[in-house]
UniProtKB/Swiss-Prot annotation:
It comes from Rattus norvegicus. InterPro entries: Beta-defensin, Beta_defensin_dom. This is Beta-defensin 20. The lineage of its organism: Eukaryota, Metazoa, Chordata, Craniata, Vertebrata. Has antibacterial activity. GO terms for cellular component: extracellular region. The keyword Cell division does not apply. Residues 1-21 form the signal peptide. The keyword Membrane does not apply. The gene is Defb20.
Length: 96
């Protein structure tokens, strides 16, 4: 009697595990599948020869906008600017 009960419990555990595909690793918002759907792209590989399928439309919505750096304003030429004198080495001198 315990064997059929154990088999029944294991059957439900296996079915519940395979209902939703596994998530991709490395912080990629996708699912591991054998074939990607039409609106999905393959980002990287998953285990057991599957692809990490990411929905293109969702991925574009969640991408963060990049911050554009402002160009530097030209300096006022009336201000004094520091400069640096580099040392030089003389290898030989020519006398005329």
């Amino acid at each position: 009697m315990k064997l059929p009960q154990l088999l029944l419990i294991l059957l439900f555990v296996v079915l519940a595990d395979s209902v939703q595909p596994k998530r991709c690793f490395s912080n990629v918002a996708g699912y591991c599948r054998k074939r990607c759907r039409l609106v999905e792209i393959s980002e990287m590989g998953c285990l057991h020869g599957k692809y990490c399928c990411v929905n293109e439309l969702e991925n574009k919505r969640h991408k963060k906008d990049t911050v554009v750096e402002q160009p530097m304003e030209p300096r006022d030429k009336s201000k004094v600017q520091d400069y640096m004198v580099l040392p030089t080495i003389t290898y030989y001198t020519i006398t005329i």
